[in-house]
Amino acid sequence: MAELKRVALMGLLLESNSFAPVSDEQAFRSLCYLSGDEILNDIALPNGELPAEIPSFYNAMENTSIGWKPLPIVVLASEPGGPIDQVFFKRTKDDMESRLRTAMPLDGVYIAE
């Protein structure tokens, strides 16, 4: 049997412009901020929090002949707003990087944006 392809799932979704107030952590937590197994659990729900890109990719991969293992990292999304708060972005980026390093080795990374 072939080895399963290890694919990280992650995303950061924000439509922003400089005229709107800064998008802080609460802006993301109020719409979608999931990490690790929370992502896989949400995919299984009929109307989860995740942006459509994540469950759509997951379901497409499940319907291929490619054996794969999804490795959920972090997915966050906000309503349209201003630029992301710099301190929150750095903390989130560092968390994503740490989780990616822990998930190594990887065959691919799916990033929803």
Task: Cite the ranges covered by each PLM segment.
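Active-site histidine-anchored catalytic micro-motif
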Residues: A8-E15, R29, P80-E113
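Glycine-rich phosphate/diphosphate-binding loops that line cofactor/substrate pockets in enzymes
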Residues: M1-L4, N63-W68, L100-D107
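N-terminal amphipathic/basic leader segments beginning at the initiator methionine
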Residues: A2-T64
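Proline/serine/threonine/glycine-rich intrinsically disordered regulatory regions
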Residues: A20-P21, V74, E113
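Short beta-strand elements in bilobed, periplasmic/extracellular small-molecule ligand-binding domains
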Residues: I66-S78
